[in-house]
């Protein structure tokens, strides 16, 4: 279940990773973010959040971190993973829809 905090973080991250313009009628094209780069950025963010959570857990086991920090890091990693899974599901759905189109 996605909490309000996770939704707010996802919204903030989507604004930071917004895709530039695809092109304009006049022929001049602005350099936008490549879709592959956008996916790579989302994956890198999820990986980083997971590593931060792992380090917080290890620090808590050693008695060097607060439990609240550990829970916050785990929640952030979970939200990132849910975002990546949602993106993956949407990409698969779009691919399947394209494959169903008649030639």
From Swiss-Prot:
Compartments where found: Bacterial flagellum basal body
UniProt GO cellular component terms: bacterial-type flagellum basal body
Keywords, alphabetical: Bacterial flagellum
Domain of life: Bacteria
Record Pfam families: FliE
GO function term, MF aspect, one: cytoskeletal motor activity
Primary localisation category: other
Span of the signal peptide: none
Protein's UniProt keywords contain Disulfide bond: no
Entries under InterPro entries matching the protein: FliE
GO biological process: bacterial-type flagellum-dependent cell motility
Family matches, as NCBIfam families: fliE
Family, similarity comment: Belongs to the FliE family.
Protein name: Flagellar hook-basal body complex protein FliE
Organismal lineage: Bacteria, Pseudomonadati, Pseudomonadota, Alphaproteobacteria, Caulobacterales
